[in-house]
């Protein structure tokens, strides 16, 4: 689906387009595990959500395990079937939790989604927001 973008230099592409290319490059090797470190952090909210959905679809189609490192609580809650919280300095595992609603399109914006966000905030030690 490169279309008109096929002959462009990377600097001429948007952040979302560059991110899609990076994901495609990673998938060429047909990995069993897709490891992503802050893959959506520099993107606007709508592009971020679209790419999150794309990655989840690809993982399902290709039967990939997704391991993602993120500082975004909402991203962790939406994408993570299992969510691990590590300590700031020593890197020791502080909490791990299951998320049976991960990746469900109608999950974002629900009361349960925000409850899980608040639970994750409490695990991290951050302030819990009232909704």
PLM features: what roles do these ranges have?
Residues 88-119:
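Conserved beta-strand-loop-alpha-helix hinge in the C-terminal portion
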Residues 23:
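Hydrophobic anchor residue at the start of the ABC signature
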Residues 1-4, 57:
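Conserved ABC ATPase "signature" region
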Residues 34-37:
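Catalytic Walker B motif of ABC-type/P-loop ATPase nucleotide-binding domains
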Residues 63-69:
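Conserved H-loop
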Residues 14:
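ABC transporter NBD signature
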Residues 8-11, 29:
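Conserved signature/switch motifs of ABC ATPase nucleotide-binding domains
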Residues 48-62:
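Helical segment within the ABC ATPase nucleotide-binding domain
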């Amino acid at each position: 689906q490169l279309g008109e973008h096929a002959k462009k230099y990377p600097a001429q592409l948007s952040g979302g387009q560059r991110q899609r290319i990076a994901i495609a490059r990673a998938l060429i090797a047909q990995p069993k595990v897709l490891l992503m470190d802050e893959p959506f952090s520099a993107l606007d909210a709508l592009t971020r959500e679209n790419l999150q959905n794309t990655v989840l679809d690809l993982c399902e189609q290709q039967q990939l395990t997704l391991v993602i490192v993120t500082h975004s609580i909402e991203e962790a809650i939406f994408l993570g079937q299992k969510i691990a919280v590590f300590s700031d300095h020593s890197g020791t595992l502080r909490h791990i939790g299951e998320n049976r609603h991960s990746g469900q399109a109608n999950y974002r914006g629900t009361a349960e989604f925000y409850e899980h966000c608040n639970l994750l905030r409490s695990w991290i030690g951050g302030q819990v927001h009232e909704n």
